[in-house]
Protein backbone atom coordinates (compact mmCIF):
# COMPACT_ATOMS: atom_id res chain seq x y z
CA UNK A 1 0.00 0.00 0.00
CA UNK A 2 1.27 3.46 -0.89
CA UNK A 3 2.22 5.52 2.15
CA UNK A 4 0.83 9.08 2.48
CA UNK A 5 3.39 11.45 4.01
CA UNK A 6 2.11 14.83 5.15
CA UNK A 7 4.95 16.23 7.24
CA UNK A 8 8.63 16.98 6.71
CA UNK A 9 9.48 15.07 9.91
CA UNK A 10 7.82 11.93 8.58
CA UNK A 11 9.54 12.42 5.22
CA UNK A 12 12.93 12.67 6.92
CA UNK A 13 12.49 9.16 8.33
CA UNK A 14 12.22 7.70 4.84
CA UNK A 15 14.70 7.20 1.99
CA UNK A 16 13.67 7.17 -1.67
CA UNK A 17 15.62 6.35 -4.80
CA UNK A 18 13.49 8.14 -7.39
CA UNK A 19 11.35 11.28 -7.14
CA UNK A 20 8.40 12.33 -9.31
CA UNK A 21 7.27 15.89 -8.47
CA UNK A 22 3.70 16.79 -9.51
CA UNK A 23 0.97 19.32 -8.78
CA UNK A 24 -1.63 16.58 -8.50
CA UNK A 25 -4.69 16.05 -10.71
CA UNK A 26 -2.83 12.96 -11.85
CA UNK A 27 -3.62 11.30 -15.19
CA UNK A 28 -2.16 8.61 -17.44
CA UNK A 29 0.75 10.89 -18.30
CA UNK A 30 1.75 11.04 -14.63
CA UNK A 31 1.21 7.30 -14.38
CA UNK A 32 3.81 6.80 -17.10
CA UNK A 33 6.27 8.97 -15.12
CA UNK A 34 5.78 6.80 -12.03
CA UNK A 35 6.13 3.60 -14.05
CA UNK A 36 9.37 4.92 -15.55
CA UNK A 37 10.53 5.82 -12.05
CA UNK A 38 9.97 2.20 -10.96
CA UNK A 39 12.43 1.14 -13.65
CA UNK A 40 15.05 3.48 -12.17
CA UNK A 41 14.80 2.45 -8.52
CA UNK A 42 12.89 0.40 -5.96
CA UNK A 43 11.51 3.19 -3.76
CA UNK A 44 9.57 5.86 -5.63
CA UNK A 45 8.25 9.06 -4.06
CA UNK A 46 5.57 11.18 -5.74
CA UNK A 47 4.96 14.70 -4.44
CA UNK A 48 1.69 16.57 -4.78
CA UNK A 49 1.94 20.31 -4.21
CA UNK A 50 0.16 23.06 -6.13
CA UNK A 51 2.87 25.71 -6.12
CA UNK A 52 1.49 29.27 -5.93
CA UNK A 53 4.83 30.79 -6.99
CA UNK A 54 4.49 29.53 -10.56
CA UNK A 55 1.02 31.01 -11.14
CA UNK A 56 1.03 34.60 -12.35
CA UNK A 57 -2.75 34.41 -12.77
CA UNK A 58 -4.38 33.80 -9.37
CA UNK A 59 -7.62 32.78 -11.08
CA UNK A 60 -5.68 30.05 -12.87
CA UNK A 61 -4.34 28.89 -9.50
CA UNK A 62 -7.84 28.81 -8.00
CA UNK A 63 -9.13 26.71 -10.91
CA UNK A 64 -6.32 24.17 -10.77
CA UNK A 65 -7.95 20.81 -9.94
CA UNK A 66 -7.11 19.24 -6.56
CA UNK A 67 -8.03 15.55 -6.34
CA UNK A 68 -5.88 13.99 -3.63
CA UNK A 69 -7.95 10.82 -3.08
CA UNK A 70 -7.98 9.96 -6.78
CA UNK A 71 -4.29 10.89 -7.02
CA UNK A 72 -3.40 8.45 -4.25
CA UNK A 73 -5.22 5.63 -6.04
CA UNK A 74 -3.45 6.34 -9.33
CA UNK A 75 -0.05 6.63 -7.64
CA UNK A 76 -0.57 3.31 -5.88
CA UNK A 77 -1.72 1.59 -9.07
CA UNK A 78 1.38 2.88 -10.86
CA UNK A 79 3.67 1.51 -8.16
CA UNK A 80 4.61 4.53 -6.03
CA UNK A 81 6.08 3.70 -2.64
CA UNK A 82 4.80 6.92 -1.07
CA UNK A 83 3.08 10.21 -1.81
CA UNK A 84 4.33 13.40 -0.14
CA UNK A 85 1.56 16.01 0.18
CA UNK A 86 3.09 18.96 2.07
CA UNK A 87 1.47 22.21 3.13
CA UNK A 88 2.56 25.65 1.94
CA UNK A 89 4.34 26.21 5.28
CA UNK A 90 6.26 22.97 4.84
CA UNK A 91 7.64 24.12 1.51
CA UNK A 92 8.03 27.81 2.33
CA UNK A 93 8.47 28.09 6.12
CA UNK A 94 10.36 31.39 6.03
CA UNK A 95 11.02 34.23 3.65
CA UNK A 96 11.31 32.79 0.16
CA UNK A 97 14.64 33.01 -1.66
CA UNK A 98 13.69 32.65 -5.30
CA UNK A 99 15.93 31.09 -7.92
CA UNK A 100 16.56 33.19 -11.00
CA UNK A 101 15.61 31.33 -14.19
CA UNK A 102 18.03 33.42 -16.26
CA UNK A 103 17.55 34.69 -19.80
CA UNK A 104 16.04 31.46 -21.14
CA UNK A 105 13.45 31.69 -18.38
CA UNK A 106 12.24 34.97 -19.90
CA UNK A 107 11.54 33.44 -23.33
CA UNK A 108 8.47 31.62 -24.67
CA UNK A 109 6.55 30.44 -21.58
CA UNK A 110 8.52 32.89 -19.49
CA UNK A 111 7.53 35.80 -21.73
CA UNK A 112 3.84 35.04 -21.29
CA UNK A 113 3.93 33.99 -17.63
CA UNK A 114 6.05 36.44 -15.67
CA UNK A 115 7.96 34.76 -12.85
CA UNK A 116 6.67 31.30 -13.77
CA UNK A 117 10.01 29.57 -14.14
CA UNK A 118 11.50 31.24 -11.09
CA UNK A 119 8.59 29.73 -9.17
CA UNK A 120 9.14 26.32 -10.74
CA UNK A 121 12.87 26.23 -10.03
CA UNK A 122 12.38 27.51 -6.49
CA UNK A 123 9.92 24.76 -5.56
CA UNK A 124 11.87 22.02 -7.36
CA UNK A 125 15.07 22.99 -5.54
CA UNK A 126 13.21 22.99 -2.21
CA UNK A 127 11.69 19.58 -2.95
CA UNK A 128 15.09 18.21 -3.96
CA UNK A 129 16.54 19.44 -0.65
CA UNK A 130 13.76 17.70 1.28
CA UNK A 131 13.56 14.42 -0.63
CA UNK A 132 17.23 13.84 -1.55
CA UNK A 133 16.65 11.33 -4.37
CA UNK A 134 19.25 9.88 -6.71
CA UNK A 135 16.98 10.32 -9.73
CA UNK A 136 14.10 12.67 -10.59
CA UNK A 137 11.63 12.22 -13.46
CA UNK A 138 10.18 15.08 -15.53
CA UNK A 139 7.97 14.95 -18.61
CA UNK A 140 9.05 16.25 -22.01
CA UNK A 141 5.68 17.95 -22.53
CA UNK A 142 6.89 20.92 -20.48
CA UNK A 143 10.12 21.02 -22.43
CA UNK A 144 11.32 24.47 -21.40
CA UNK A 145 10.78 23.54 -17.76
CA UNK A 146 12.80 20.36 -18.30
CA UNK A 147 15.63 22.35 -19.91
CA UNK A 148 15.77 24.86 -17.05
CA UNK A 149 15.70 22.17 -14.35
CA UNK A 150 18.59 20.36 -16.04
CA UNK A 151 20.44 23.69 -16.23
CA UNK A 152 19.82 24.41 -12.54
CA UNK A 153 21.03 20.96 -11.49
CA UNK A 154 24.22 21.43 -13.49
CA UNK A 155 24.89 24.98 -12.28
CA UNK A 156 24.28 24.18 -8.61
CA UNK A 157 26.05 20.80 -8.73
CA UNK A 158 22.98 19.01 -7.39
CA UNK A 159 23.78 15.25 -7.29
CA UNK A 160 20.54 14.13 -8.92
CA UNK A 161 20.10 12.53 -12.34
CA UNK A 162 17.28 14.17 -14.32
CA UNK A 163 15.45 11.68 -16.52
CA UNK A 164 13.13 12.91 -19.28
CA UNK A 165 9.92 10.97 -19.93
CA UNK A 166 8.20 11.12 -23.33
CA UNK A 167 4.90 12.96 -23.73
CA UNK A 168 1.84 10.75 -23.33
CA UNK A 169 -1.08 11.48 -25.65
CA UNK A 170 -4.78 10.81 -25.76
CA UNK A 171 -5.96 8.42 -28.49
CA UNK A 172 -6.72 11.41 -30.74
CA UNK A 173 -3.23 12.91 -30.32
CA UNK A 174 -3.84 15.62 -27.70
CA UNK A 175 -0.98 15.81 -25.20
CA UNK A 176 -2.22 14.77 -21.77
CA UNK A 177 -2.51 17.63 -19.30
CA UNK A 178 -4.35 18.28 -16.05
CA UNK A 179 -5.79 21.36 -17.77
CA UNK A 180 -7.58 19.32 -20.43
CA UNK A 181 -10.52 18.74 -18.10
CA UNK A 182 -11.33 22.46 -18.40
CA UNK A 183 -11.98 22.18 -22.14
CA UNK A 184 -15.59 21.89 -23.26
CA UNK A 185 -16.59 19.60 -26.13
CA UNK A 186 -15.91 22.19 -28.84
CA UNK A 187 -12.69 23.28 -27.16
CA UNK A 188 -11.48 19.71 -26.99
CA UNK A 189 -12.01 19.46 -30.74
CA UNK A 190 -10.22 22.77 -31.39
CA UNK A 191 -7.26 21.68 -29.27
CA UNK A 192 -6.48 18.84 -31.67
CA UNK A 193 -5.11 21.40 -34.13
CA UNK A 194 -1.93 21.53 -32.03
CA UNK A 195 -0.88 17.91 -32.52
CA UNK A 196 -2.09 18.09 -36.13
CA UNK A 197 0.23 21.05 -36.79
CA UNK A 198 3.17 19.27 -35.18
CA UNK A 199 2.89 16.48 -37.75
CA UNK A 200 4.20 18.93 -40.37
CA UNK A 201 7.91 19.16 -41.09
CA UNK A 202 8.36 22.92 -41.41
CA UNK A 203 7.32 25.87 -39.30
CA UNK A 204 5.60 27.47 -42.32
CA UNK A 205 3.40 24.41 -42.82
CA UNK A 206 2.62 24.31 -39.10
CA UNK A 207 1.38 27.90 -39.26
CA UNK A 208 -0.84 27.01 -42.23
CA UNK A 209 -2.46 24.18 -40.27
CA UNK A 210 -3.00 26.34 -37.18
CA UNK A 211 -4.70 28.99 -39.31
CA UNK A 212 -7.43 26.45 -40.10
CA UNK A 213 -8.74 26.48 -36.53
CA UNK A 214 -10.40 29.73 -35.34
CA UNK A 215 -10.90 28.26 -31.87
CA UNK A 216 -7.15 28.21 -31.23
CA UNK A 217 -5.21 31.38 -30.36
CA UNK A 218 -1.47 31.01 -30.91
CA UNK A 219 1.00 32.44 -28.42
CA UNK A 220 4.22 31.14 -29.94
CA UNK A 221 5.50 28.56 -32.39
CA UNK A 222 9.25 28.13 -32.72
CA UNK A 223 11.84 25.56 -33.69
CA UNK A 224 14.54 25.68 -31.06
CA UNK A 225 17.95 24.12 -30.57
CA UNK A 226 17.50 21.63 -27.72
CA UNK A 227 21.02 22.31 -26.45
CA UNK A 228 20.58 26.09 -26.06
CA UNK A 229 16.80 26.67 -26.18
CA UNK A 230 17.46 29.46 -28.67
CA UNK A 231 16.02 29.49 -32.21
CA UNK A 232 17.53 26.64 -34.20
CA UNK A 233 19.90 27.17 -37.11
CA UNK A 234 20.79 24.89 -40.01
CA UNK A 235 23.76 23.74 -37.95
CA UNK A 236 21.65 22.69 -34.95
CA UNK A 237 21.98 18.96 -34.32
CA UNK A 238 18.95 18.58 -32.07
CA UNK A 239 15.89 20.60 -33.04
CA UNK A 240 12.45 20.70 -31.47
CA UNK A 241 9.23 22.49 -32.37
CA UNK A 242 7.57 24.11 -29.34
CA UNK A 243 4.08 25.55 -29.36
CA UNK A 244 1.68 27.20 -26.91
CA UNK A 245 -1.69 28.87 -27.16
CA UNK A 246 -5.20 29.07 -25.78
CA UNK A 247 -8.47 27.25 -26.34
CA UNK A 248 -11.49 28.38 -24.29
CA UNK A 249 -9.09 30.43 -22.16
CA UNK A 250 -7.14 27.25 -21.30
CA UNK A 251 -3.42 27.40 -22.00
CA UNK A 252 -2.06 24.36 -23.84
CA UNK A 253 1.55 23.35 -24.59
CA UNK A 254 3.11 20.77 -26.86
CA UNK A 255 6.36 20.00 -28.66
CA UNK A 256 7.96 17.54 -31.07
CA UNK A 257 11.50 16.49 -31.93
CA UNK A 258 12.34 17.67 -35.44
CA UNK A 259 14.69 16.45 -38.13
CA UNK A 260 15.90 17.78 -41.46
CA UNK A 261 15.99 21.36 -42.69
CA UNK A 262 14.16 24.24 -41.03
What residues fall within each predicted segment?
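Nucleotidyltransferase catalytic core that binds NTPs
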Residues: 2-215, 224, 228, 256
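Phosphate/ribose-recognition catalytic cores of enzymes acting on nucleotide-derived substrates
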Residues: 209-262
Amino acid sequence: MTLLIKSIDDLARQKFDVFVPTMGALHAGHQSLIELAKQKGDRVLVSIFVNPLQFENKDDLAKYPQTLDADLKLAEAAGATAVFAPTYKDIYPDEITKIDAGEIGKLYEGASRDGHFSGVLTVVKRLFDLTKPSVAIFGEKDFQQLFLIKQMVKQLNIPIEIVAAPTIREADGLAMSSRNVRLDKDGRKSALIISKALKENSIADMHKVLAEEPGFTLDYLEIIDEDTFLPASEGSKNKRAIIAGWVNGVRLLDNKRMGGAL
